[in-house]
Each structure stands twice: as structure tokens, then as C-alpha cells.
Amino acid sequence: MRALHKRVSWPPDFKLCQVRLFISEDSPSQVGSESQDHLQAKSPLASHPSDDNLPPGFGGPFSANESQIKLSDIPLIKWKCSVQILLDREWKVVAGDESKEVEAQNERELRVLEAFYPGASSIPPNPSVPADVEDSHHDDQQTIVIPILPVEDDDIAMDSASDFPTQSGVDVGTEPSITDENTSTSSTLPAGPDIMAALSAISNSKEQGSMIDQDLLIKILSNPKLVENLVANRGSAGSVSSNTSSLYSSSTHEANGVVTTAPISSNGQFYAQPPITHIPPMAYTPHAPQDQPNYGAPPARDASYYKNLIQQHGGDRQETPPVQHLGYRYNLQPGGGPNPEMVNSSNNNQRPRDSKPKIMKACMYFNSARGCRHGANCMYQHDATPYQPRNLNNGNINTSDMQNAKRMRFDRD
């Protein structure tokens, strides 16, 4: 059989019809007039959200029957200006009912007659002076100046300290200047020799590192009753001494290195001295020390005596080696100061005072090839006597030295 070919058959012309696409927003009257080039088939409704879900005023199609609101139909409220507020000048003045000046002003108005001036030219240039002020004579230069800046506590303490010498009757300008910084505090307080000695001991204790309770001393010195008792007790013991002994003590203190500001009487008061301009080095010769036992009364106690008492009872006692063991010979220079001269060469090797006790056994490394690495701080004795050279007088070695040397050799073995 022959295969049948498919054929396309077109209907006749009278059966053909024309199909047009239009937008739903367009009115039906405009469908036929517009060109169909831009028209497309509508997409499926499932891809677009429904317009019914949109709130009013957020787009969406307007129906033809919906009425549009005109702005002219909206009623408008006429704006009226507010009432103008007029401020009264009397409102700006505070009455001050609780002020005390109100009563004074009312009494003044009742006492003074009211005056009326017809014109501005008749008004006096100056106000009326109150009756209680007319008879008073006040000078504006004597008005007390009130400082605006706050005054610090340190400034008050410094001012009060500077006022002490003037209150006690001692002129500060007449006293000689003090070169030592440690005794500078003692010249600013108007007290007796006991207080001066205590202050010098406090200043020395700061440098020496002693255990003196400075707060207790300050409390004692700040209490005037305790100070009077101390001065009375000490004054009874030193009342026998005369002015000559005080002058002698001041000269001896300068020789010992203690600087005194002014001579001290038996009452514990200071006497002003004339200003010292320049004294030559050999202006006076000090008294011989053998003249001191001639006085029947005991010598006046200086600041060093009280300083030693405080160091013995209030803190650690720091002993200083005597002068004769230092190997120095003191010769007074023309200026009065000591002139140290070396008289013993062995003092160059002098070791400082050991704080720990040494062991009596000799050090086995001393004077050996290895040597002692501790040096002067070694706990054992460094005795060089067994190694002294031969005696030049008889050419022999001491037998005791030989025995000591043998013992040290056995100890090393």
C-alpha cells in the first residue's frame, strides 16, 4: 500500500475570523483604534500577586466607577494669630518678701519725706546721704582686702613659722647665718636649749637612720605644758651657771664643730647679737682647756649632750671610734679648722668595722697562691704576722712565728 501523506487543509475565506488582543485597563472603545504591535498575550495570573491584597492608596487598578476626591472639596481651617502677650515691667522686678532689706527700705521710706521734682534739671546729681553715715569718717584705703584665691595649708604653716622669731623678741636679721643644713630648723623656733637640742637630734636621726620616734617628739614639743616642765626641770640644774659659762660654752662648741646661733642665758632665753660683717681668722684665741676645772659650777650642757641622750634611750646607739685611734694629728689652721696629717701609714689598710663576729680560726686561703675571694668580708681571721720578713737587727726569725707558720701548714694539709 502506498503511504498516505498528511495534508493541511485551510478553511474557506468566509469561515476565517480575526482575533485581537487588548489590555484590561483600556476601555473597550479604544481597543480598535490603537495599533496591535505592542500588544502581547497576558501572562498567567499565578505569577503576579493579586491586587486585592494591596491596601488602598498603594497602587492597584482604579475602576472606572470609582469617584476621585478633589482638593477643593476638602474643608480648610482658617488660621488665626494668637493674642499678643504684653510683658509688664513690674514683672521683671523681684519683690523679695523674705529679704531683710525690705524692712529696712520700708523704715527708710517712713523716715524720709517723699520729694517731688518738677523736672529732670531739678534732680540732684548725688543721692541723699543717710543720717547714720553723715557723722562717720571712713577711709577707703583701710578697707580689708578679701583674697579670692584659696590659701593652701602649706602657706599658712610657712607664715606661722616665720612669725615665731618676731614674737619672741629676737631679730632675725641680727643673727648670724647658719651654714649647716641640719641646724637650720633650730634657728626658727623660739624655745629653750632643750627644744633646740631635740630638734637637732631629730634632724640628725634622719641622716643616721636611727629608730627615734619622731612623732612622739613632735607631740611633746607641740604641747606647751610639757615643754615648760622640761625647761623648768633642766633650768633648776643649770641655774648656777653664769653668763661667762654660756659664752665659754658657745666658743667651745664652735671648736668642736657645733654651730650656735646666739648665746643662751640660764633662763633659756635668746639675746640678740649685733650683725657680724667679717671677722679675721686670728681675731681671738680660744681659752685653754685646763681653765675649765677652775669653775665650781658644772659646765652648761650643749646640744650634743641631749643628742647623745636621745640616741642612748630612744634609738640605736652608733658608736664612733675615738679620734686618737684614727692615726691623724690635728693642727689648728689660721681659719680655725682642723688640718689632718697622716702619721701612720698602716691606716691606709684599715678595714671598716665588721657587723658580724669573726671566727678565731685563721683563713686557709689567705696569703696563698689561690687567695681568699672574700677579702675583708671573710669570716675567718686574716693574720699576716707569720709571714713577716726576717728581723734586720739580729738576722733571725722569731721562734713563735715559726711555730704559728707550722701550725697553719698542718691545718692546710
Swiss-Prot record:
A zinc finger (C3H1-type) spans 357-385. Residues 28-61, 159-191, 333-356, 389-413 are annotated as: Disordered. InterPro entries: Znf_CCCH. The keyword DNA-binding applies. This is Zinc finger CCCH domain-containing protein 6. It comes from the Eukaryota. Disulfide bonds: none annotated. The keyword DNA-binding applies. One of its GO terms (molecular function) is DNA binding. Keywords: DNA-binding, Metal-binding, Zinc, Zinc-finger. It comes from Arabidopsis thaliana (Mouse-ear cress). Residues 176-189, 389-403 have a biased composition (Polar residues).
